[in-house]
């Protein structure tokens, strides 16, 4: 006869089996949790370590006191001196490089003091933020001299100036205005219209009506879609009526070739060209130029351009073809188009 296991022993075995299943489930959950943690640690460890709550890296006011920012020539744009964040000695250079370097309190999100705090701290996955006693040096592709001259050239006007090496992609100049001195912040900065948008990097995060530089897109479309584009002429009397819109021009250019119309930046000619090309063609070439795309500058996203091509009238299309109407283009996107 087959021997039967005593009831008490069977009960004990069932309990052991249940406990084994529970332990296995807990082990799987632990392994899954550790996997998620490790994935996030590798992806976001730098952000965790460079948090403003880390008093090893920030002072009591939340100012990063680790790392040095330098321009391409090794000129120090910002460093830590005696436990305090310091900036370049020249006030105009400080204003000209503010949106690239960043302010003391992280108001300018695209500044390297905020966006690349993990790199400035010397963080690495093995040693954390304690791998470098005084943080790391972060070299920018910018040249402080170019920024200085560009900021002065703006003459107090709001706007942005940027220069890049189209062969290497290095940004040599990136100025945004209005700006201010990070070591002497105006007390009424957030209420004063003079400083409206001072925290915004207009090169990366804004979009503007492009104006006549958009004619380069219209010109490209004309050369590739109008068979006689280089031999025919367009007449300019100072304005042209297209649909229900009067497209005005800066002068009276008379009969002119495409080359001459481009040299004159003639609104009348390019509005006629835009109407002939049609909205679908201009939309295609605008997208092909990348003017509706967002780009990444070392991980910093740019604003997207916007164009309203739907239900556009002939007159509105004429204005769009010369860079007016509702066209909005990000400066970085246009810089890439011109350098491409």
Sequence positions of predicted segments:
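Beta-lactam-recognizing serine transpeptidase/beta-lactamase-like catalytic domain environment
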Residues: 73, 167-212, 217-340
């Amino acid at each position: 006869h087959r021997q039967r296991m005593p009831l008490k022993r069977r009960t004990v075995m069932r309990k052991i089996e249940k406990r084994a299943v529970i332990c296995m489930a807990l082990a799987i959950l632990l392994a899954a949790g550790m996997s998620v943690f490790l994935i996030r640690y590798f992806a976001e460890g730098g952000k965790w370590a460079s948090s403003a709550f880390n008093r090893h890296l920030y002072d009591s006011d939340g100012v990063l006191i680790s790392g040095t920012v330098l321009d391409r020539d090794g000129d120090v744009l910002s460093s830590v001196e005696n436990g305090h964040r310091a900036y370049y000695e020249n006030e105009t250079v400080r204003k000209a490089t503010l949106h690239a370097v960043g302010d003391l309190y992280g108001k300018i999100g695209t500044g390297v003091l905020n966006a690349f705090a993990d790199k400035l701290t010397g963080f690495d996955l093995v040693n954390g933020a304690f791998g470098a006693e005084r943080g790391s040096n972060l070299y920018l592709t910018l040249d402080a001299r170019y920024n200085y001259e560009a900021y002065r050239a703006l003459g107090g006007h709001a706007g942005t100036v940027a220069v890049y090496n189209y062969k290497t992609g290095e940004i040599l100049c990136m100025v945004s205005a209005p700006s201010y001195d990070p070591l002497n912040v105006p007390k009424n900065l957030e209420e004063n219209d003079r400083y409206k948008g001072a925290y915004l990097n207009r090169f990366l995060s804004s979009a503007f009506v492009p104006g006549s530089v958009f004619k380069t897109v219209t010109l490209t479309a004309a050369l590739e879609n109008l068979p006689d584009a280089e031999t025919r002429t367009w007449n300019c009397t100072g304005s042209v009526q297209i649909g229900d819109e009067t497209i005005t021009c800066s002068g009276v250019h008379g009969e002119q070739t495409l080359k001459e119309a481009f040299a004159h930046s003639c609104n009348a000619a390019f509005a006629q060209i835009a109407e002939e090309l049609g909205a679908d063609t201009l939309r295609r070439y605008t997208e092909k130029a990348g003017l509706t795309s967002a780009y990444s500058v070392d991980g910093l996203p740019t604003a997207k351009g916007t164009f309203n091509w739907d239900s556009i009238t002939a007159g509105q299309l004429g204005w769009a073809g010369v860079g007016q109407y509702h066209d909005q283009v990000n400066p970085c996107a246009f810089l890439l188009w011109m350098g491409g």
